[in-house]
Amino acid sequence: MTDRVTVGNLRVSPVLYDFINNEALPGTDIDPDTFWSGVDKIVADLTPKNQDLLARRDHLQAQIDKWHRARVIGGFEAEDYKQFLTEIGYLEPEPADFSVTTSGVDDEITTTAGPQLVVPILNARFALNAANARWGSLYDALYGTDVISDEDGAEAGSSYNKRRGDKVIAYARRFLDGAAPLASGSWTDITGLRIDDGAVSATLDDGGSVALADPQQFVGYHGEPDAPTAVLLANNGLHIEILIDADSPIGSTDKAGIKDVVLESAITTIMDFEDSVAAVDADDKVLAYRNWLGLNRGDLAEEVSKGGKTFTRVLNSDRTYRAPDGETELTLPGRSLLFVRNVGHLMTNDAIVVDDNGADGAEVPEGIQDALFTSLIGIHGLRSAGDDDTKNGPLLNSRTGSIYIVKPKMHGPDEVAFTCELFSRVEDVLGLPQNTIKVGIMDEERRTTLNLKACIKAAADRVVFINTGFLDRTGDEIHTSMEAGPMIRKGAMKSTDWIAAYENQNVDIGLETGLSGKAQIGKGMWAMTDLMADMVEQKIGQPKAGATTAWVPSPTAATLHAMHYHQVDVFAVQSELAGKRRSTLDQLLTIPLATELAWAPEEIREEVDNNCQSILGYVVRWIDAGVGCSKVPDIHDVALMEDRATLRISSQLLANWLRHGVITEEDVKTSLRRMAAVVDEQNAADPDFRPMASDPDNSIAFQAAQELILDGAAQPSGYTEPILHRRRREYKAASNVG
């Protein structure tokens, strides 16, 4: 790129430079020259530290590889392994007990347990939908998913099916019986609602009336006391809105005139710059930053076509109600509280390069760029200091003046400390008070898991979130022990002892370090986007395990998962778990090696085909369409939400089997060619899809998928980004894609 803007020792892409100066900086009172001078200084000071941390990863991995290669035949003793990891500094001393001191954190994080959406920032429509998913229709979520069965003529067709609707109403009434029970009887029996002397009164079939079992659950309403149009209830810190309109199509079929039950749903949302996006150059990054800016300024809008009509989707306003006394006004947030997930420490991006005597030098670490620019933009979502009004508009993000950044893929406490140093330097450049920028720690790398308490201590005054990520964590488990021997099959990983120990330890150490009431303790994604009945049955296990939040793939899933937090008082669970350590270091260090290679040839082929199909189905959309998060049908046509984490585990498992002779390179190539035809068929209805099977040698996507497996053992920590970014850039250049 020859037309870059020179800023000190940096050369900046003009599309980024213009965006920052003309769109992001106005309204922040930050002088452009001062800002860019600060960027230059941070890059100069912190890039060498970033590089040193990556070099340490490689050095530790080389030592571990060498140790395992010397023992791959005879095996090893657990104590010897532990001692070795301690000697090389992989295992660090656990710090003495402490409690985090994070302050200025919004209630959505500290005192509210509920679902968390993760959404790709490159898609403005998805981002708007997610931000607006703070409230969701339970009726719609039930009617449109398999939570309500099709039995007895209750199929969901092109027009409203009253039989299905009646099932939805009955389900919602049962939910209300559990979340906000009446003093006697059931919500199924009511024929109306009214407000009497500041309390809810439900009229019953027999003409009598009944109050709530706990009158304090009534917190607001719309309309008149004798004919409310909405009744607002609260349970376990979450709100339930009962909408009443006997003249509406649904309300007219309901003896109480209830037309919907609306649940407070996605309490928080992560706007993702990382695993769910394909951002490989300055143009991609600026699109992402611009969407983040629109969310923080409150002016992001997107034209949406639905049902033959086009409308503009914008961010929802806050919701107001009359308090039970009929006089006071109650205001509740209308939008999800937003985190932003930056990229990790590994990748660089050509949006900014070092000036090499007037030529383009090395690309600047992308994580440093993200920290600077997403934090700058985050200022637009903060309340002005000492002022009840907002600085740039009515749609706040944080009401306490914090910017929330999730930092992924950190390996150990030194990398967490580096992130905190970076955030501190960014605060200085932006003129923000220290610790304005909070950090969410993804516990998804093995060295972080094994040193989790030290990682939290390194961010004790910033941490607002720890979260397990089974897929990335398994990918790192495989890669770290790549030389130890062949691993078990992918599907068996979830039932291993180390996974259970990993999930338990995250909660236990979070509680031990004082996160309850100060920070989220989170758990992972439900990936089967169409199997909502299974999700409703199974995902309740996460709040029961002490997680104050867990990831969901859609607004609909957020509304359904919200029911679990009415059924489980997570903070009570945390009180019961406090003071326990349910896992041991030995369990966490148990490598998921196959104890004997007793797989039949058809089992091996099934595993290879499954993973090859998954890899191809995701990679082809990443490379050819620039889509980083896809609902990809698996080999059995079950739709799965795929991102780079799923790609990492699939490619690393096959790389491991290839390394140890379970499969051959020819097995991989043959399966990829066979599965390419399957993926082509699954995408046949997409007019923009480029088939792979007919000419795999000239399909960049196919070649990327093959490279991810065949060269998987050599990838840093098993990450897929280096190959994906290079291949996506290759595709964009070959296809003249901007």
Curated annotation (Swiss-Prot):
Cofactor(s) in the UniProt record: Mg(2+)
Enzyme Commission numbers on file: 2.3.3.9
Cysteine sulfenic acid (-SOH) modified-residue sites: C629
GO biological process: glyoxylate catabolic process; glyoxylate cycle; tricarboxylic acid cycle
Keyword Hydrolase appears in the UniProt entry: no
Keyword Transferase: yes
Binding-site positions, acetyl-CoA: V118, R125, F126, S276, R313, P553
SUPFAM superfamilies assigned: Malate synthase G
Gene Ontology molecular function: magnesium ion binding; malate synthase activity
CDD domains (alphabetical): malate_synt_G
Pathway in which the depicted protein is active: Carbohydrate metabolism; glyoxylate cycle; (S)-malate from isocitrate: step 2/2
Enzyme class: transferase
Active site per database record: R341 (proton acceptor), D643 (proton donor)
Binding-site residues for glyoxylate, renumbered to this chain: R341, E444, G469, F470, L471, D472
Residues given in the record as Mg(2+) binding sites: E444, D472
Catalyzed reactions per annotation: glyoxylate + acetyl-CoA + H2O = (S)-malate + CoA + H(+)
Subunit structure: Monomer.
HAMAP family: Malate_synth_G
Sequence similarity: Belongs to the malate synthase family. GlcB subfamily.
Function as written in the Swiss-Prot or TrEMBL entry: Involved in the glycolate utilization. Catalyzes the condensation and subsequent hydrolysis of acetyl-coenzyme A (acetyl-CoA) and glyoxylate to form malate and CoA.
Name of the protein in question: Malate synthase G
